[in-house]
């Protein structure tokens, strides 16, 4: 028997639940991050299998949502869970789910479904889901990509997703030969350059693709944008 850890006397500032590692390569991720004294960012990322489209939904929700989740955390003594033994039952092709809780005082509690989690943990998850569903009802849904127009050439540039100030983009080589792409990555809103990064160089074999990303300092406003890499471009709309 391990000695229970004292309850954490500090504000919850971040929590996430990530499920990945299944046979089909899918991934789901939810996170809540305290932004200021009034609001938190609730982000949802879902991909059914490895090559399927990514669905992103993000909301500003009341920061008291994190306080309510902290109450559930304390109710079920989740600070004890990292010391639980690993489960003796596992499925090789099943996804693993990880849970993380970060606190203002620097404490970080992390555990996963590989552990022998007690049955009461399912009750805990139901309570958290109910809290989040109510938060969304009164939350502010944030703009995201509603349409895009990828370049239609042998070399195609398209947007994979826009998530937490990150734009993931895909370069695809439909030609029958290896190509080299060398250019500066630029992002425009209308005629205004809002992001520029040093030159990148990609070597793509025929019928291959490359996934990469850029990280922005601030969220994109509603509007029309153009992502440019050398001579290839992709326009998209945030709404």
What are these regions (language model features)?
Residues 43-56:
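Acidic/histidine-rich, surface-exposed loop or edge segments in extracytoplasmic proteins
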